[in-house]
Amino acid sequence: MPDHAHSAIARRLKRANGHLETIVEMIEHGRPCAQIAQQLQAVESAIESAKKALIHDHLSHSLERSFKLSGAKGQAALRDFRAIAKYL
């Protein structure tokens, strides 16, 4: 069973998938390219956001398990990592 973060990521990707299906319909109905490109950008951003969330969650959990063994120094390193990782 996926954890809360993975459930949220799955929901985000399902929304992006639905949005992508709508874009296919836009193309099939001859909608203007500028509108299609705008919608594609939105889907691309949603997928990129989901990817980042998944990677951050995985790294955070993996490092948390590793650093728990390192005591206070490890916890400080984990906090530093989390602070900088948001800029990835």
Regions found by a protein language model. Give the residues of each.
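Solvent-exposed interaction patches of small proteins and small membrane subunits
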Residues: 1-88
